[in-house]
Amino acid sequence: MEDDRDRLIVIVAGYPREMEQFIDSNPGLRSRFTRYIDFPDFEDQELSQIFGALCRKHGLSLTPDLKEKTLHHFHWKAENAGRDSGNGRMARNTFEKVVHEQADRLSKAGIYDAEALSILEAADLESPAEPMWREYRKSGRGYIVKCEHCEATYSWNSAIEMPVAKCDKCGREFNAEFGMLIE
């Protein structure tokens, strides 16, 4: 590393505690790795957006109920699942499980048409947050979206297909594909 330091970049990545143990494992590492970038865990809305992007990439659409249930699923995971909860990998794993459940549901029903294969439903997401989602729906609290530029808040409805919205306050566009729970 010393001989080529003007041409060499070494990047190591991992969870904070394990990276600290790695750096401490050899006295010479701390002086060689002098720059650190912390990436915070994704919020539940961001994990839902990653999930939505994976669905779009694979030509799949979500029912309004699944969009809501997804928010509750990632919210529950963030509060209960520990340090891996805000990890983008969790969104990918959830996507893969949902697609698997959809395939099971459709094959059991003998449905094989292209339209059905392109729609993911709330029943396709097995989630420990299901009771919370059902209670939240009964409460009538609804959902919101926030402009990430100016923090203006708007009501959000899962039945409206609007991945991007324009903020009335600052005039900039922001992601409105998934809302947030009203706490």
Regions found by a protein language model. Give the residues of each.
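Canonical AAA+ ATPase core
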Residues: 1-39, 57-58
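Conserved C-terminal "switch" segment of AAA+ ATPases
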Residues: 21-24, 39-84, 104-108
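Conserved RecA-like P-loop NTPase ATPase core
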Residues: 33, 47, 51, 91
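C-terminal helical "lid" subdomain and adjoining coupling/linker elements of P-loop NTPases
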Residues: 77-140
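Residues immediately within or flanking Cys/His clusters that coordinate Zn2+
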Residues: 142-144, 164
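Short, cysteine/histidine-rich loop/knuckle motifs that typically chelate Zn2+
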Residues: 148-149, 169
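Cysteine-rich micro-motifs
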Residues: 161-173
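Short metal-binding segments enriched for Cys and/or His
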Residues: 172-183
